[in-house]
């Protein structure tokens, strides 16, 4: 029987749901829990098919968002990292009344590079899909290493991410491929342009997966949202710069 892993902790009055990225699970937020728990009621979720949320197969973005929403508090601040940012954004589009505020971290409404849009080359994502079936473990490790590349403690941060993956049940190759498919195909640029939910977009200046140019483009296209680019961070700013990250989240969520 498929069941979503959902853990709640914290002393605050505001509900804050944290959604992790591709290949990982809610353990990735451990350094954030101690910092955020005094201020929020935290909801730590393993996305369907990831970590402790076993029994789910690959699914489209909309289905993933709906499954997560069924267990969510009536109204919350939603924070999504990378793939989790797409899921949180889809939830804000599907059920705006249930989203008090939205925070996306190192995420993009369209991860794939298009003619005039900065992103990951589609053949790179296809390459990862191909390699997954050949060498599952190594491909996940390579993807994790990419996320911390260029930061001061890149190796240490990559080890931490790898530990998070190994600590919980691994997603199946099918689920991982499904996640890459979402990253390759999703394009929420147009729908999110009309979003009325307050939106904060956090980026790392050194991010090799979501180019910092995305921040500037969306500043122009989504003038109602706010962006912050963290100068020495890459794709996992909450791991490389936990205190600065926490400050941004608290300031925005409690404003």
UniProtKB/Swiss-Prot annotation:
GO terms for cellular component: cytoplasm. Residues 16-242 form the AB hydrolase-1 domain. The keyword Cytoplasm applies. GO terms for molecular function: pimelyl-[acyl-carrier protein] methyl ester esterase activity. Keywords: Biotin biosynthesis, Cytoplasm, Hydrolase, Serine esterase. It comes from the Bacteria. InterPro entries: AB_hydrolase_1 (IPR000073), AB_hydrolase_fold (IPR029058), BioH (IPR010076), Carboxylesterase_BioH (IPR050228). This is Pimeloyl-[acyl-carrier protein] methyl ester esterase.
């Amino acid at each position: 029987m498929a069941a979503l892993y959902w853990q709640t902790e914290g002393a605050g009055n505001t509900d804050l749901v944290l959604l992790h990225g591709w290949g990982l699970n809610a353990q990735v937020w451990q350094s954030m829990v101690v910092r955020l728990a005094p201020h929020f009621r935290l909801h730590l979720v393993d996305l369907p098919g990831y970590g402790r949320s076993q029994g789910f197969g690959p699914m489209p973005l909309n289905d993933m968002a709906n499954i997560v929403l069924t267990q969510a508090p009536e109204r919350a601040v939603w924070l999504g990292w990378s793939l989790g940012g797409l899921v949180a954004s889809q939830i804000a589009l599907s059920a705006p009344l249930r989203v008090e505020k939205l925070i996306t971290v190192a995420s993009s409404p369209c991860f794939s590079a298009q003619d005039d849009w900065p992103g990951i080359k589609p053949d790179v994502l296809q390459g990862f899909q191909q390699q997954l079936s050949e060498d599952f473990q190594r491909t996940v490790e390579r993807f994790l290493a990419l996320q911390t590349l260029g930061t001061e403690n890149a190796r240490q941060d990559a080890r931490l991410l790898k530990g998070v993956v190994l600590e919980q049940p691994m997603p199946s190759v099918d689920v991982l491929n499904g996640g890459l498919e979402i990253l390759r195909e999703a394009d929420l640029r147009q729908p999110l342009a009309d979003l009325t939910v307050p939106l904060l977009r956090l980026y790392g200046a050194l991010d090799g997966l979501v180019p910092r140019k995305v921040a500037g483009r969306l500043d122009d296209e989504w003038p109602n949202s706010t962006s912050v680019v963290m100068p020495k961070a890459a794709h996992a700013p909450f791991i490389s710069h936990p205190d600065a990250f926490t400050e941004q989240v608290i300031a925005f969520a409690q404003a």
